[in-house]
């Protein structure tokens, strides 16, 4: 995170974000007006998604701006046709809006099932990794010292900035759960302390999904190499 990158110069979102409503509105406008153009294309690219992701999650989770506000701002622009040559923006923002719907879904899921913070959604997977957790592996993962460059870079960046793109978050969890056999509750508690945009409903559902203990989602193992 300390190394300057030519692709990150003059970016409007920034690696480490400031808080507050004024900053939140600034980030919202820059995303709707410009940065969303490559939202889908760069979703899995850690180098570029720093800027093309919405970067609104910290403001949403801290109540600085609301989902309704984001949707309304998007609708205003869509109705006025933004400007010429904005089809890409509309398509990408529509995809982002669908993720806002999923955000609400997961928050409601935790409210309906508050025990998903502590228990696997499918009881057959409860405690499946309890006897395998290697403390050395766990500490190496927490410190970003596993020896796998992309994993370590993501963890160190998260420690430094409090934020990661979605796919990189998923990879960190997948690596901990499948490669190191760390119980998702242990890794989940640690990650929760690092995210500046920590949202319990999203966090614990994703921890379980990326660890393969829901019983309904496909097993996703990210290649760290």
Regions found by a protein language model. Give the residues of each.
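Glycine/tryptophan-enriched, flexible segments
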Residues: 1-123
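Hydrophobic alpha-helix feature that most strongly marks membrane-spanning transmembrane helices
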Residues: 75, 105, 111, 156-159, ...
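Secondary-structure capping and boundary motifs in well-ordered enzyme cores
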Residues: 48, 52, 58-62, 66, ...
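Short acidic (Asp/Glu) and glycine-rich catalytic loops that position anionic groups and cofactors
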Residues: 7, 49-51, 71, 129-135, ...
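Active-site core of glycosidic bond-cleaving carbohydrate-active enzymes
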Residues: 99-101, 107-150, 156, 166-170
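A glycine-rich phosphate-binding loop feature that marks nucleotide/adenosyl-phosphate handling sites
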Residues: 44-51, 122-128, 173, 208-213
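C-terminal, helix-dominated tail/subdomain
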Residues: 125, 129-132, 190-225
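Contiguous, well-ordered alpha-helical segments that form the cores/surfaces of helical PPI scaffolds
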Residues: 57, 136-140, 149-159, 169-179, ...
């Amino acid at each position: 995170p300390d190394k300057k990158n030519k692709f990150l110069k003059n970016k409007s979102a920034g690696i480490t974000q400031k808080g507050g409503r004024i900053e939140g509105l600034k980030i919202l406008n820059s995303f709707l007006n410009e940065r969303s153009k490559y939202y889908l294309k760069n979703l899995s690219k850690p180098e570029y998604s720093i800027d093309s992701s919405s970067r609104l999650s910290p403001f949403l989770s801290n109540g600085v701006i609301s989902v309704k506000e984001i949707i309304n701002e998007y609708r205003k622009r869509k109705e006025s046709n933004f400007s010429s040559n904005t089809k890409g923006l509309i398509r990408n923002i529509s995809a982002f809006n669908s993720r806002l719907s999923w955000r609400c879904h997961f928050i409601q899921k935790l409210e309906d099932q508050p025990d998903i913070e502590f228990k696997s959604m499918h009881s057959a997977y409860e405690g499946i990794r309890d006897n395998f957790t290697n403390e050395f592996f766990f500490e190496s993962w927490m410190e970003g010292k596993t020896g796998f460059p992309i994993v370590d870079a993501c963890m160190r960046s998260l420690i430094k900035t409090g934020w990661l793109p979605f796919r990189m978050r998923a990879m960190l969890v997948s690596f901990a759960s499948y490669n190191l056999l760390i119980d998702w509750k242990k890794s989940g508690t640690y990650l929760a302390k690092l995210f500046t945009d920590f949202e319990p409903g999203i966090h614990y559902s994703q921890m379980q999904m990326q660890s393969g203990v829901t019983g309904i989602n496909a097993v996703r193992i990210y290649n760290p190499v």
